[in-house]
Amino acid sequence: MAEASWQVQLFQRSIKKKDKVRLLQKNLCLKPEDKILDLGCAQGLISYLLQQKGGFWIHADLDYQNLLTARVLLQRNLVQTDSSHLPFLSASFDQVFCLDYLEHVEEDEMCLAEINRILTSQGRLVLAVPQTGSFFLLHRVKPLLGIKLSDYGHKREGYRLSQLQAMLAHHGFEIEKHASFAKFFSELIELLLNFIYMKILSPRKKVQLRDGHIRPMSAKEFDQQKKSFQLYSLVYPLLWGLSRLDKLLFWLKGYSLIIWAKKISSPENQQK
């Protein structure tokens, strides 16, 4: 049996990403004829998993290097874009998945305006972002560990739900439902893994990618960390079990937020 791609191998040993994909797949509603844009496809893993459920997918990212990496997994329909103008015709997509992308772009309002423009009149937006607020204490720990927003490629820490409600309403969207995941234990484990990779295993990475450099970002980097990954695989069951303690924190919100919204209008004041 052929070895799974490095992206899939990382996913199989992930924590937050597994929870995210589970939520996305649980709420996935695709028709065979749907045209879907994955805006911010990164190295292609989530596109790869979701497109197996149907529809015609286009995969877009700011970074050419990300697209080169994703092409091995996705093979076709990859487009380089920018955040302020999407190179697609108006009303050309039935759904847009914008997953962990909005926090990476300077002009997030313009990005939402462009998403509205390219969606059909009954189009849907699936948006995933980091969630922030007064009680998200681990956000305050990152600077103490020497971890900056720029290490993640972030332009901002994240968003509050109320903030996104206002932004989406301004750009002609109505939130249908939302869910959060990655509570304290999952986020703490993820933070420690990011710290180990950035500060110990691979502290001198110079390549600046849209989504930072908090883990292996290419097959070459993954191969360089093969022994570390094998060691991590041994302790992964324990880390996964610890992350499930999040279920005990039923009153807390998660550090990651997913929103499902529908387009209800094309505002006249929307920037083009």
PLM feature spans:
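Short, glycine-/aromatic-enriched active-site segment of Class I SAM-dependent methyltransferases
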Residues: 130-155, 166
